[in-house]
Amino acid sequence: MKRTLARYQKSAFRSFIRRHSKYAPIVFFIGGFIFDTLTLGRIDRTYDLTVLCLHMTSLSISLYLYNLADDGTWKNTFLERYEEYLPLAIQFFFGGLSSAYVIYFSRSVSLSKTASFFIILVLLLIANEFLKKRISNKYLQFGVYYFISFTFFTFMIPVFLKELNTTIFLISGAASLVSTLVLLSIIYTKSPSTRKEIKLAKMVFIIIAIYGIINLFYFLKLIPPVPLALDKGIVAHEVIQRNGNYEVTYESEESFIFWRKHKLDFNYSPNQRVYIFSSIFAPTDLKKSIFHRWRRYNSQTKEWETVDDIGYDITGGRDGGYRGYTYKTNVTLGEWEVQVLTEEEQVLGVIGFEIKPRSLQQPLHLKTSKH
């Protein structure tokens, strides 16, 4: 045993970690993020559920072990030799669980849906890099843990209950709040060093404040309806259902490139139908009502005006997303957008386009694809 321990203490990995201790936590955070980005696909797959549940469980255990290490709890046990790796494990699981948002919403047509998460992620990275105590700062540690826990439960509970609504969101928030406070109370009770470093009332206030802010964002419709995601949104000249597929005919334009503005031109002829086709990812057997809100920009008032709300139901489970379309006739020229919304009016995505008069001299470049 002593020989094994001596080899461990002189190992190349241990030496590497000690030499680069300043940057190791941030590397492990990004490593967890990249690992899940490359391996996760569908939130309702057994593999994805297992990985995310293991990440959350391992993160909770790592936090417990790490916070009790300062009290010498693991001295003369096999855990003592691994104590210096616990912060790295915490960073890895933080990164891995954070990546769930990006993975399950990266396919969305509306890039703004994930922008808020990227901002939060950047703030986490900056705070993690520049705070003097980094992950040893327990206020930061439990604040981030609660945010990660909240997002974890907002993914998992709808998948297991096969339902998504405001009540489910509130249940998810309550589950994350209770689990975080239970873990905090256990660590606070068993760790004298933790009781010295933090004020329990302040820590609980921070967690409840995060809970309140997330709920405020939800009711202000600033949080996407996880785990639903908009796969595709197309303004089309024709949509035909044939042999279980949808044949969608639309104008082929470079504007479909994701880094450019999603404002397409629709060359319109009088009395022509304007179609909006959308495919939405939803976990297996999750049922949800979706509707398209057609809005027209009023150039005189400088405001968007709602013209029509047209709905349809979805049942999840299809890899390519559950498909549906709506259409309108006798539309006016100008700027339009169609919001893809849940019945709680949470935005899955926005499809923007401009209706222009069709020139007979200029042929249309139409493309038909199957979905």
Indicate residue ranges for each PLM-predicted region.
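Internal/C-terminal transmembrane anchor helices
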Residues: 195-226
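Short acidic/polar inter-strand loop motif in beta-rich domains
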Residues: 331, 341-354, 358
